[in-house]
Amino acid sequence: MAILKRGARKKVHQEPAKRSANIKKATFDSSKKKEVGVSDLTLLSKISDEAINENLKKRFLNATIYTYIGHVLISVNPFRDLGIYTDAVMNEYKGKNRLEVPPHVFAIAESMYYNMKSYNENQCVIISGESGAGKTEAAKRIMQYIAAASSTHTESIGKIKDMVLATNPLLESFGCAKTLRNNNSSRHGKYLEIKFNNQFEPCAGNITNYLLEKQRVVSQIKNERNFHIFYQFTKGASDAYRQTFGVQKPEQYVYTAAAGCISAETIDDLQDYQETLKAMRVIGLGQEEQDQIFRMLAAILWIGNVSFIENEEGNAQVRDTSVTDFVAYLLQIDSQLLIKSLVERIMETNHGMKRGSVYHVPLNIVQADAVRDALAKAIYNNLFDWIVSRVNKSLQAFPGAEKSIGILDIYGFEIFEHNSFEQICINYVNEKLQQIFIQLTLKSEQETYEREKIQWTPIKYFDNKVVCDLIEARRPPGIFAAMNDSVATAHADSNAADQAFAQRLNLFTTNPHFDLRSNKFVIKHYAGDVTYDIDGITDKNKDQLQKDLVELIGTTTNTFLATIFPDTVDRESKRRPPTAGDKIIKSANDLVETLSKAQPSYIRTIKPNETKSPNDYDDRQVLHQIKYLGLQENVRIRRAGFAYRQVFEKFVERFYLLSPHCSYAGDYTWQGDTLDAVKYILQDSSIPQQEYQLGVTSVFIKTPETLFALEHMRDRYWHNMAARIQRAWRRFLQRRIDAATKIQRTIRERKEGNKYEKLRDYGTKVLGGRKERRSMSLLGYRAFMGDYLSCNESKSKGAYIKRQVSIKEKVIFSIHGEALHTKFGRSAQRLKKTFLLTPTTLYIVGQTLVQNAMTYTQDYKIDVRNIQAVSLTNLQDDWVAIKLASSGQPDPLINTYFKTELITHLKRLNDKIQIKIGSAIEYQKKPGKLHSVKCQINESAPKYGDIYKSSTISVRRGNPPNSQVHKKPRKKSSISSGYHASSSQATRRPVSIAAAQHVPTAPASRHSKKPAPPPPGMQNKAATRRSVPNPASTLTASQSNARPSPPTAATRATPAATPAAAAMGSGRQANIPPPPPPPPPSSKPKEPMFEAAYDFPGSGSPSELPLKKGDVIYITREEPSGWSLGKLLDGSKEGWVPTAYMKPHSGNNNIPTPPQNRDVPKPVLNSVQHDNTSANVIPAAAQASLGDGLANALAARANKMRLESDDEEANEDEEEDDW
């Protein structure tokens, strides 16, 4: 089967199109990681909490922790280092759109920095999630990226960058602690603003602190720790500090050892202490300031070691005054005054506007412990606020701030077994952040659709404003307002204040988001229902240090302590100081106002498990977080309009490869408007119009499946281009290999002769002149090629048969044929078989049709060494009996055209095989039963076959047994070929394109490479001969095994050379006589007339011309594929007929006369003979000048070579057969 090649393209030279400056050339991303799940939750086919969880789980287990919801980043804490925050990874995100790279916190940072520069807008990122979900880590990575991405032109800019980064270890040490859920939990909230100058370089910064958890200083639950700085200081303090401040190990202090957890996994306190000291130096804290900070920390630790006992009156008394003396030394206050402030409380009585009496009320042990702890908490809280203000002072040292990027890292939503005032404050702030998240997200979405004039369907969502009002409202009063009223009513008694607050809570029972339960109340937050304890909640809301403690600190001689406690006691003031609830409401509203002035980005963090394990994924816990974070609503809001949107330029840059209007060979060629380019891309990609809308500046795609289809087509583009390049390269290499093989074969044949012809000659000797020869066996091109079914190739029918019958060895001979099958009481049948010969075994393969699929099975497996003899007749039939030496099987009787070649291969493999040739074939029809098959001459038998009936073979008389193989014909001479081409062009007028359209289309069977049908005498063998190389087809040197079909109408613009003209150049150029002088002009010759030798009913195709035996027609064109273009004598119909069915009409004696401009008469057309030989008529008068003839021939040869070069890709010549 010939290799099909595409026709060559007509290449038109064009100037390369200028690529738009806004569209980048597409490149194949070889480092692209195979995606697990979807990188954007809006692309989920099904939207549900379970589907979101399943997608996050797949990515988490694949070490992919980041996922988008539109522009919102979802981050799952991996609890391990994934190596995704290196400088190399950071560089991959610089200057990239978020769709060009996988989801990452660096992509959010790049987007903020880019938007600030491009749109001159303030940016902020809101990081939310529960404790231990990775909020602080995300904030650190954003600061890391912005510091690295922004340019540095001056030393001061570089210093600001270093200071911004130094705030992380400093504030982590003083504001983070180990909890049961997180080893580095932020116990405060902060909003860091990085300010940039007009060149977008960081030039300043500011930190706002929110609600430090002061209670952690004095008490922690079991297996938790105090703030990191206490353990860093007690473990890593220098000898000078230990001597000056009396620093001991953490086990020696109540505040650090009471919870039973001194160390924590993944935390190195000594190393972190050095990082803290380094950060202090970078920020600009002097050594004296550092000494005072650590002096206060030592004082807090020693305050915690102050303990009390009961005196004789049952009041509190300091157990060890040496401890209070050392605390007084550290705070630089009077020791007795300190003791008095810890065990007594000053009370004043008022009489209207007059000041009343002052009383010193002694405290019991519980009250004294509370006063001690209040002093420690006050010192640490004020120290933390001073550190934040000191950092801000350093960051504001450089003027010129224009725009800013804000990073909000705030505590996550908290639900504990016992929840008090701290939890209601934390959860209130998270409610406010959720509110602004929903408002800004939905508002931004609505504004986008309105701006782009896009139609969309609004989505319902839960607005938690009602919960925020429940907590913060003043009219009607909310929970904080009710708490303030209770404190004002019973300020002197905490228990009374709690009872008053419980009574006021009855006002909220009608609110659907509130529930009252005895001494507890429930608020139904967006993240879940939280139960709060009433006991002690009002006292925490006061947030006031006792006036006597304030007066105590006012007596200090330490200027640093006086600095961090700037407020003095105003005993005359009657105005109620602000409570903790007032402060948190003001801070939250200020935060919302600040965030509303910036363009927000969002990071929603998720904690996958409580075990802090990198391999555990708790579905139940994650599902709870998905619900209270509102991820499903966020996805629905995002997809309420469209799952994907992109500006025209970016969309074209991404997908222009999908449209031939916009691209060629990977280059962007579109010169028009980008909107038109978008339309062409969507149109050429067959995207339905209802799946997208075009806005003013952006394209909006409805469903994620549409985007998947576009991305898939874009990916396949690169695969298709690679396949085309590979195909062209393989074709080039194969042509080189074929050319080299042809040259090598020619050289070997010149030196040693053709091995296939040698094998043929050896086979002729094997028969020893004892058997009549068939005409096809004597052809000069006949050679013993062996594997006619191409079994040894990877993709062929022979290889398929070989695999079916499980043959592992190399096949040296393969052919289709027949085998005689006998049945008891019935006539023998000739069944189709396939014969495969390997170096050791002869296989006879049968075929059966099973469910419309051909199945091949082994009928015989014969060891070559077990073959005793082969038996043949002495006539030209093709029957062979394989006689086995010892076997329980009968001897197979087979029929194949290439019997001589099969016997030759068997003889070479087993020299002991006897070749028995006689008038009959003898073989064992059954084991032990000898059977004889006679052969007789019958001229009525088929010319190319035989008749088998009743153990008798009837066949025509063949060639004599001693007939020799014809000499292989010489190849065409290039000069004669050129002469022939020149003559052909001169003698016949080329058919115009318009005329070619009227030529009948070739029969449908010829389009499938099917040869013309054989004459009726050969049709009884057509089925078996169809897959056998026809020796008759080897008459022409340019033919291959598969007979080519005649050209279609579209390829017949130029007529082919006549067979007679081709015959003129068959190796006789040395004897060509000089042409005679030009004769006078003659009339135009008529077409040759042919007569139908057989009936040709045709296949029903309109391009065929049905004929009856004896019909006479004109033959206007003859093709080498076996078809001729015929026309009725009256010219009423024209069509294709098989050449083998036609013979020259006896009354046709017209010889065409030569044209005026040539001096060589045109030869007569070949007559097609039944024996497949040609009787060529050579003109007698060829007596012109040899020089003129050679000149014309060379000119024609040059013209032919030029034409062949132009059409080389379209019509490559078939490889020449060697046999």
Curated annotation (Swiss-Prot):
Bias kind Low complexity: ranges: 974-984, 1048-1063
Domain IQ, chain residue ranges per copy: 719-739, 740-765
Stretches assigned to coiled coil: none
PROSITE patterns with a match to the protein in the record: MYOSIN_MOTOR, SH3, TH1
Residues found modified as Phosphotyrosine: 359
Residue intervals of the TH1 domain: 771-961
Source taxon at top rank: Eukaryota
GO molecular-function term, one example from the UniProt record: ATP binding
Record's compositionally biased regions (Polar residues): 951-964, 1030-1041
Annotated Myosin motor domain residues: 36-715
Compositional bias of kind Basic residues: 1-12
Pfam families: Myosin_head, Myosin_TH1, SH3_1
Record function comment: One of two redundant type-I myosins implicated in the organization of the actin cytoskeleton. Required for proper actin cytoskeleton polarization and for the internalization step in endocytosis. At the cell cortex, assembles in patch-like structures together with proteins from the actin-polymerizing machinery and promotes actin assembly. Functions redundantly with LAS17 as actin nucleation-promoting factor (NPF) for the Arp2/3 complex. Motor domain phosphorylation by PAK kinases CLA4 and STE20 promotes CDC42-regulated actin assembly.
Complex formation: Interacts (via myosin motor domain) with SHE4; this interaction is important for proper localization and may regulate the interaction of the motor domain with actin. Interacts (via SH3 domain) with VRP1; this interaction is required for localization to sites of polarized growth and may regulate the interaction of the tail domain with actin. Interacts (via SH3 domain) with PAN1; this interaction is important for late stages of endocytopsis. Interacts (via SH3 domain) with BBC1 and LAS17. Interacts (via C-terminal acidic tail) with ARC19 and ARC40; ARC19 and ARC40 are Arp2/3 complex subunits.
Misc: Present with 2280 molecules/cell in log phase SD medium.
Name of the protein this chain belongs to: Myosin-5
Organism field: Saccharomyces cerevisiae (strain ATCC 204508 / S288c)
